[in-house]
Amino acid sequence: MENQRSSPLSFPSVPQEETLRQAPAGLPRETLFQSRVLPPKEIPSLSPTIPRQGSLPQTSSAPKQETSGRMPHVLQKGPSLLCSAASEQETSLQGPLASQEGTQYPPPAAAEQEVSLLSHSPHHQEAPVHSPEAPEKDPLTLSPTVPETDMDPLLQSPVSQKDTPFQISSAVQKEQPLPTAEITRLAVWAAVQAVERKLEAQAMRLLTLEGRTGTNEKKIADCEKTAVEFANHLESKWVVLGTLLQEYGLLQRRLENMENLLKNRNFWILRLPPGSNGEVPKVPVTFDDVAVHFSEQEWGNLSEWQKELYKNVMRGNYESLVSMDYAISKPDLMSQMERGERPTMQEQEDSEEGETPTDPSAAHDGIVIKIEVQTNDEGSESLETPEPLMGQVEEHGFQDSELGDPCGEQPDLDMQEPENTLEESTEGSSEFSELKQMLVQQRNCTEGIVIKTEEQDEEEEEEEEDELPQHLQSLGQLSGRYEASMYQTPLPGEMSPEGEESPPPLQLGNPAVKRLAPSVHGERHLSENRGASSQQQRNRRGERPFTCMECGKSFRLKINLIIHQRNHIKEGPYECAECEISFRHKQQLTLHQRIHRVRGGCVSPERGPTFNPKHALKPRPKSPSSGSGGGGPKPYKCPECDSSFSHKSSLTKHQITHTGERPYTCPECKKSFRLHISLVIHQRVHAGKHEVSFICSLCGKSFSRPSHLLRHQRTHTGERPFKCPECEKSFSEKSKLTNHCRVHSRERPHACPECGKSFIRKHHLLEHRRIHTGERPYHCAECGKRFTQKHHLLEHQRAHTGERPYPCTHCAKCFRYKQSLKYHLRTHTGE
């Protein structure tokens, strides 16, 4: 009986997969593979006893109640490992097992029958499992008489069967902490590895943040540098803007002055040459040059309206000088008139009174104007309010009947040379007809002012022929009730210098003003009283300080030298086919030919000669452009453009324009020119001869030729006289129109001799040929890199300056190159 109680229980083996599926959660996988733990459902003591098919019937219910809560010992092959819950339950059940020593078991025959049934059961195909003690009615309880050879060898022990259950239980208890420590160690090791991985991830993120921080710091430094550069750039822009505002103010003031001049009809001042640095024109006259003084007796003999007229004339002259920024102090004469006092005379007036210069050289160049004030003998003052003054201008050839006299009296006409009339040189001129209309006929039967003109004698004319600016000189302006301005009138042969597309600048001369004061007993001539300028003194001494560098001629006035030098740069005169007289401008020729059409020649039988050939240019050989003006046979024709010429040399020069030949080369800079005169003008740049320069009065730029100045002035006026007949585009230069027309005609006249590629413009060909020659004339001053084209250098320099001139209209980004902006715009448009 004791042996039966101490015999261990034997349980059938359970598959490993089922053991892993029903193992406790805290037990590691490796331990489960080494131990074979039976699930609770296979342990009879942990589950209620259920009859199975083939099991023995239960004989008693009493043992069932005692063994229902009992946990048998479980042994396996290999290391014995049990879960903690099973071991605790087994330990708690050792007491009841010890108290059941007297329990009766079924007879051996029944036990053997039960074992045989269990061995044939489908649930027990493996080796049988023995249980040490089992209740009598438990179907799994084995008989104590089972041979030891049929038992598991691991369960055989020399220890007594009585002590075996307790020793196995203590061994299980000793082996139980080992998997728990191992599990804890593995869990800690896994947790440490997880923490290390997190630390590594955090370290990587920290390094990434440090890199991004460094990048941001660099960007901030670049932004600060850009901000400093932008501030410096902005400061320079502010300086430039201040300069522009200052220039704008100066330009605004000049425009106001020009409006005043146009309002006062002072056109002569617009033709004055400006200063070398762009300052205001140098007015060659002073207020005293155009002022008229009266003695006390003469002033007393004047009527009130005459005094008012005198004041208006003086005031108009003063305003004309001030309107052009002419820095003069206010004359005493104007101050006296504003205070209502009598204008006092200078000290020289008394000594010079009554003197009339007889030497023509002592007088000023041009015409002499006399102002004659007439009164009748009675000196009647019956009219309280005198009518306007009757002013009559005797321009040689104007008859008295043209002006008329309501009182039937013809005023005295003091004519020195009636045979030389002004109409000779003013036929066909519109300015004198305007002057004639401006002379308002102011009638008074008792007194009047007659403006008379005198010309210098023929000998003086011949002497001063080259000095005259080829225009009549103007006196100034008469304002108030009576206005009459003597403007420069172009002569038919000298309306404009050659090479220009517009008439030449009019220059103010210094006409001698003769004053005839009123006298009760008759007409009395008074001398002109004014201060002699340095220019007048040179004229009296006969000095000619201005010399032409080309031909050696000298002149008294610089403007005469400038006009004369235009003869040297003339490229194409216009000749009259009837009298072989040449002119500088086509308009002059048209005016001259009008004489032949109207009067049949240069001489009028009624009024004498109407045209003085001395005022025209002397006949000279025709130039290539003479084919456009004048008549005559032209046997030499150009096979390229069908132009005809009268001389073979003219045709040869013209053909150079088609061949592109430039036979004249500068020895200093190796620049070549098509015409010799172009080379001469270019060499003045090297020689430093800047006297012959044409300066723009608006911006101060100087040019070597008047045509270049005229072309430049179109940039200020915005004029575009050359229009394309196909697309109606307009251009300021004819060459630009020619190049534009090639776009429509698809003409490409400039071909590369090496690769045959053709271009519309010549400078495009020059840029292209640098590809073959390897020339790179444009180099960067910062890094020394060289480029073939200038705009490539400008684009490259933006990398050094940081300039980004192309902003995006959709966002705030700016770009250095235009192509980059185009690529960026596609992100907005979605192309």
From Swiss-Prot:
User: Where are the zinc-finger regions (C2H2-type) in this chain?
Assistant: 546-568, 574-596, 636-658, 664-686, 694-716, 722-744, 750-772, 778-800, 806-828
Q: Map out region (Disordered) in residue numbers.
A: 1-143, 339-364, 398-432, 488-545, 600-634
Keyword annotations from UniProtKB, A to Z: DNA-binding, Isopeptide bond, Metal-binding, Nucleus, Phosphoprotein, Repeat, Transcription, Transcription regulation, Ubl conjugation, Zinc, Zinc-finger
Please report the stretch or stretches of sequence annotated as the KRAB domain: 285-356
GO CC annotation: nucleus
Cross-link named Glycyl lysine isopeptide (Lys-Gly) (interchain with G-Cter in SUMO2), sites: 330, 452
Subunit:
Heterooligomer with ZNF746.
Protein name per UniProt? Zinc finger protein 777
Source organism per UniProt: Homo sapiens
